[in-house]
C-alpha cells in the first residue's frame, strides 16, 4: 500500500515503510504506479531504470492505477480542507503533483521526467 502516508523520509532519505497489510505478489503495474505516486519529480526515472522492463499493457495499467491513487489523494485533501471525516489537507498537493507526473509522462523520453 505504497502512498505518501505510508512512506517515512528523514532528511530526504527513505527511512521506513508502514502498513504492510495490503502487500501481495501480483501485477507489477502496482509497483510502477507507486513510483509515480510516491517519488518526487525526476526521481522515478531511477526506479524505472532499475525495474525490469514492462510491456505497454503493464505501463497503461500502471498509469491508470497511479491516476486513480492520485485522484483519491486529491479527494482526501479536498475533504480535509472542508473538515470532513477522513480528510487530510496535506494529501491534496501530493495527489495533484502525482497526477501531473502521470499525465505528462511519455514512453521512452518520459521515464526521465517521471
Segments (PLM) and residue ranges:
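Active-site acidic catalytic loop and adjacent metal/ATP-binding pocket
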Residues: 1-32
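Helix-rich C-terminal or lid/interface subdomains of diverse kinases
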Residues: 22-25, 34-114
Amino acid at each position: 500500500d505504497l502512498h505518501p502516508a505510508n512512506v517515512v523520509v528523514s532528511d530526504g532519505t527513505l527511512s521506513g515503510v508502514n502498513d504492510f497489510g495490503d502487500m501481495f505478489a501480483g501485477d507489477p503495474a502496482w509497483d510502477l504506479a507507486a513510483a509515480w505516486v510516491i517519488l518526487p519529480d525526476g526521481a522515478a526515472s531511477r526506479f524505472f531504470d532499475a525495474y525490469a522492463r514492462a510491456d505497454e499493457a503493464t505501463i497503461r495499467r500502471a498509469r491508470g492505477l497511479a491516476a486513480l491513487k492520485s485522484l483519491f489523494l486529491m479527494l482526501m485533501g479536498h475533504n480535509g480542507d472542508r473538515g470532513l471525516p477522513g480528510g487530510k489537507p496535506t494529501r491534496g498537493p501530493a495527489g495533484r503533483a502525482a497526477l501531473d507526473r502521470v499525465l505528462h509522462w511519455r514512453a521512452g523520453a518520459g521515464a526521465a521526467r517521471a
